[in-house]
Amino acid sequence: MKKIVIADAGPVIALARIGQLSLLPRLFGKVLLTDLVASELTDGGVFADTAVLQKAFAADWLEIIKTSDQDLLQCRDWVNLHQIDMGEASALILATTHAALGDDVLIVLDDARGRQAAQHARLKALGTAGLLILAKNAKMIVEVKPLLMALQAEHYFLSERLLKAVLQLANEK
């Protein structure tokens, strides 16, 4: 059984914005993105972090997977059913495909509806905050709180309830 990690755009953008994109390969080695997610990250140079993301695309730890025509049709169904975007749908479909092959799959996404869809599909899901806890537990970062505050400073929404729960899990105040 292979360990497969698939990421959606949200956590990749969040980590890039706070200078912690390197946590993904340090925690997981190779990370898969669908071509739809990759397009969300780079098309039009919308994000200030596009240069950082382009560098990541050139690295060997990030692998872009082309979404098949059949999967694109399935994506539209997932978009309608779960009210998620095409990138999230493509990542979830890639994850379910690998899970059906018997792989140990983790999908990294932040969107609440996307996480509900992952749960519905019986996939293991982890968000940016969970990644930061893993990184702290692996002694890759010292504290989670300053990074959560940096995310908020970058206009990344974190509910008060989530902040409290994450800080408690990280043994921080």
Model features per residue range: what roles?
Residues D104, R115-K173:
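Acidic, PIN/NYN-like endoribonuclease modules and their adjacent C-terminal/linker elements
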Residues K3-L106, A112, H120-L123, P146, ...:
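Active-site-proximal, substrate-binding regions of enzyme catalytic domains
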Residues M1-K2, K173:
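Short, low-complexity, intrinsically disordered N-terminal peptides in bacterial proteins
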